[in-house]
Amino acid sequence: MKLICYNQFNQDLFHNGMARAVEHAAALGFDGVEPLDMMPTHRAAPIYEMFDARELRRRLDGNGLCAPCCSWAIRRCDRDADAVLDATYRYIEFAAELGASYLHHTLVLSVTPLPDAPSYEQMLSAVLPTAKKIVKRCEEYGMQCLYEPQGMFFNGIAGVSGLLRAVREEYAGVGVCADLGNSLFVDESPLDVTAALIGDARHVHVKDYLCINPPRADLKGHLSRGGVQLVDCRVGEGDCRLAECLALLKNAGYSGAYSIEIDADDDTTRRAMDFVRQNG
């Protein structure tokens, strides 16, 4: 089992620098890291311009760490295709320098319904040409492109399955990043979604949420499509049924990495790592 430092690594990388980020991940006991940036980035420059991938690879190797998957959050894959592809291709080159096997990327980064939102079929048609070009470039660099349940369109069993079917009409090799919490945004059980997509799972994101219904004004969180409030909590203490999800993956023979996607102090992070080790 490989445990991957996700949120903590990226917070360290952008706030404390490359050396601190790598050393902290190693000190916490992680086996690797998962870089993340957005397109368009909200930072002064994208990650591939701020940090030299070869230097990062050297530091990772020196600390016994790997980078099996790199994540890329595209806000709207259906708009500005040339800009999306230019930035994404450069990120793929960055990921390849790190030796990544997988690129996970979003297509429509939204955890709330879009105003005047098109139908699922309309959005799928809009994102598909750009998505396929990204898959092609990944394959040219020896990487597999992954999609996770995310947002208000390509989420849940039908949302992800429909995307996979459409892309596989031309590129059969795409897979799934099994996020163990995101399907709650469309009111579907992470356990059910993981079970449905488990044969395609190549990478896993671990997080947990409390489901609060009716929502409480004193708690910070997001609202699901059906109005349930989703509040971040410690791994294993929420409503994602993580122990069952991890057991399901283990029993299915999943042998990939588990990426810890939480914002937490070191003790809470270590407890999350222990939870995954004990249940996965």
Task: Label each PLM-derived region with a short phrase.
Residues A73-D82, R234-G236:
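The substrate-binding groove and active-site-proximal loops of carbohydrate-active enzymes
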Residues D31-G32, C66, S101, Q144, ...:
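Residue-level detector of anion-binding/catalytic polar loops
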Residues M1-N7, Q11, H15-G29, D61, ...:
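Histidine-acidic metal/acid-base catalytic patches
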Residues M1-Q8, C66-I74, S110-L114, G221-S224:
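N-terminal small/glycine-rich loop or linker at the start of catalytic domains
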Residues T41-R43, I74-R79, S110-T112, G151-N155, ...:
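Short, small-residue-enriched loops and turns at beta-alpha junctions
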Residues E34-L60, S110-P113:
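Glycine-rich, proline-tolerant flexible connector loops at the mouths of alpha/beta enzymes
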Residues E34, C69, H104, L146, ...:
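Conserved beta-strand positions in the central sheet of alpha/beta enzyme cores
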Residues A19, E23, R54, R59-G62, ...:
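Active-site acidic/histidine proton-transfer and metal-coordination neighborhood
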